[in-house]
């Protein structure tokens, strides 16, 4: 009867360890069959035996597990109760056998549990370190430290930046030199044209002075000609008067000839 209870408790514990918890909705960590067997023996003996021994053994187990307790994080309270429940109805005849077996297997079960849990924690640490190394390698050595982003400076980036800055400076200097040359050329053309204008202005002034002199001389000449014409007219008038009075026949004949000559022409 006790063997049937042990097999039932073993199957129940194995089913619990390999199936997810309904209440917690988390998966339990798989535990070796030998350890499950020992845990089944210890749980059945503790549930049927004295309560004082069970409290002391639970305290010792909590102290001995220590670091390895992290491996039971996925096991919920209901799973532990199912694992530790066993087959209480079938434990009436084998209480003494279970008490004696528990005394010898308690130390070995806790040691094996600590060893397995320590190995699992080391594996998890190695996996975490590997993931961190992969992430650092994929990001190329860059990341965030205290909220600030840092990047490793690459030499090609510095060289390209220097080259581009040099090209920009050269372009700026070329533009400046081109503008300076254009300004110099423009100023030279303006100076040449201004010199030509000054020469033309001076020539115009000289010509105006000459024209003014000629005009003044022409005025004087015209005035002199007017005076001469006036004197000549006066003399002709005087001669006509004299010829008309003193020589009227000759004067009239001479006048008729002059009129006929003008008509024939």
From Swiss-Prot:
Keywords: Coiled coil, Endosome, Transport. The keyword Transcription regulation does not apply. One of its GO terms (biological process) is endosome organization. Component of the biogenesis of lysosome-related organelles complex-1 (BLOC-1) involved in endosomal cargo sorting. One of its GO terms (cellular component) is BLOC-1 complex. Its main location: other. It comes from Vanderwaltozyma polyspora (strain ATCC 22028 / DSM 70294 / BCRC 21397 / CBS 2163 / NBRC 10782 / NRRL Y-8283 / UCD 57-17). Residues 14-27, 102-111 have a biased composition (Polar residues). Component of the biogenesis of lysosome-related organelles complex-1 (BLOC-1). It is found in: Endosome. Residues 52-63 have a biased composition (Acidic residues). Pfam families: KxDL. InterPro entries: BLOC-1_subunit_KXD1, KxDL_dom. Residues 1-63, 79-111 are annotated as: Disordered. Transmembrane segments: none annotated. The keyword Oxidoreductase does not apply. This is Biogenesis of lysosome-related organelles complex 1 subunit KXD1. Residues 196-245 form a coiled coil. Belongs to the KXD1 family.
